[in-house]
């Protein structure tokens, strides 16, 4: 599976990308939302794992861009965030086209099963 991981926390991206690579997935990492969008525009991914709370161009900004350009419903998006989301926030993300919302920290095998 070809996976794009967008998260500003380099410790998290290192652990997750190493785990997913060992499990046989091809994992591309972006520590910035805008750079993540550039990857999306130039490469076809099976899944995007996206953090919401990033400095500058946030995960919400990435979702807005994908929605405005008709890409949100075409991509499998898994939100992985430490942010405290209400049930309504989670429902709204799912209604927009996000496939799964997961809370950090999460066991890596559970994350992989969600892909």
Model feature map: region roles:
Residues 31-35, 58-64:
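Acidic catalytic/metal-coordinating carboxylates
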Residues 51:
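Active-site residues of response regulator receiver
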Residues 61, 84-100, 110-113:
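Alpha4 helix (beta4-alpha4-beta5 surface) of REC/receiver domains from two-component response regulators
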